[in-house]
């Protein structure tokens, strides 16, 4: 029975090309049961068979169906497209220029200054109200508390938790075309689950995968010394 339970082929990764560099059986994972009795041997074989079933199920879940097990160039539709991390830039602040922008520009929040007379009061005081398109109706005590940039805010005003002397611009870049070719380490782990190859030497030699031969060359995509 032990011969019917193969040792899985563990894939290795070729980082420069983003391809699988072949696979080999890892005999270090085999349990030594040479001096064990029939009961222990049966338990060991049960563990090995259960491990292989888990690997076969995992491969069925995460492996992308494809004709070529280890394609030389993965199409863009099958490659994970990773978005680069955003870049944050701190911009200088110019309070006077921002106030002028607030008073003369169209904006979604904030506004310009005008003097109004409150009911029951004989004095004129400064209030700030939005001009043009305004989605909020908040008042602030000082025009310096307004943030025309607002870190892309749509409503609200005032200093809140923002630093009035600091403005932050976030830049997000992306590729103009989807990437193709090699795959990354995360996708490699999902695509190349340890392979369970039953009866590897029972068929014709030409049917044995080149990737399982020890001297397989990932660059040449062939095994040295084999036609």
UniProtKB/Swiss-Prot annotation:
Induction: Expressed in the late phase of the viral replicative cycle.
Phosphoserine found at: 118, 174
KW Phosphoprotein (keyword) present: yes
Post-translational modification: Cleaved by the viral protease during virion maturation. May cause the middle segment to be shed from the capsid.
Signal peptide: none
GO MF, one example: hexon binding
Keywords: Capsid protein, Host nucleus, Late protein, Phosphoprotein, Virion
Site (Cleavage): 111-112, 157-158
GO cellular component: host cell nucleus; viral capsid
Positions annotated as propeptide: 112-157
Keyword Phosphoprotein carried by entry: yes
In-chain residues carrying the UniProt-annotated modification Phosphothreonine: 64
Similarity field: Belongs to the adenoviridae hexon-linking protein family.
Other noteworthy facts: All late proteins expressed from the major late promoter are produced by alternative splicing and alternative polyadenylation of the same gene giving rise to non-overlapping ORFs. A leader sequence is present in the N-terminus of all these mRNAs and is recognized by the viral shutoff protein to provide expression although conventional translation via ribosome scanning from the cap has been shut off in the host cell.
The protein's assembly and partners: Interacts with the peripentonal hexons as well as the hexons in the facets. Part of a complex composed of the core-capsid bridging protein, the endosome lysis protein VI and the hexon-linking protein VIII; these interactions bridge the virus core to the capsid.
Protein name: Pre-hexon-linking protein VIII
Organism classification: Viruses, Varidnaviria, Bamfordvirae, Preplasmiviricota, Tectiliviricetes
Gene this protein is translated from: L4
């Amino acid at each position: 029975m032990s011969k019917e339970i193969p040792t899985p082929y563990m894939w290795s990764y070729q980082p420069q090309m983003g391809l699988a560099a072949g696979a080999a059986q890892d005999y270090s994972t085999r349990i030594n049961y040479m001096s064990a009795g029939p009961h222990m041997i049966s338990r060991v074989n049960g563990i090995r068979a259960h491990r292989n079933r888990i690997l076969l199920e995992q491969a069925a879940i995460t492996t992308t169906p494809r004709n070529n097990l280890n394609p030389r160039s993965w199409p863009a539709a099958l490659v994970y497209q990773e978005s680069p991390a955003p870049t944050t830039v701190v911009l200088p602040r110019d309070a006077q220029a921002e106030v002028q922008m607030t008073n003369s520009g169209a904006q979604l929040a904030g506004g310009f200054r005008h003097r109004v007379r409150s009911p029951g009061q004989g004095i004129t005081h400064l209030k700030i109200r939005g001009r043009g398109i305004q989605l909020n109706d908040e008042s602030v005590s000082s025009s310096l508390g307004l943030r025309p940039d607002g870190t892309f805010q749509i409503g609200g005003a005032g200093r809140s938790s923002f630093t009035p002397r600091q403005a932050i611009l976030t830049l997000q870049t992306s590729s103009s075309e989807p990437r193709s070719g090699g795959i990354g380490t995360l996708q490699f782990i999902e695509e190349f689950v340890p392979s369970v190859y039953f009866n590897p030497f029972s068929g014709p030699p030409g049917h044995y995968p080149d990737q399982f031969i020890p001297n397989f060359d990932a660059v040449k995509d062939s095994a040295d010394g084999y036609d």
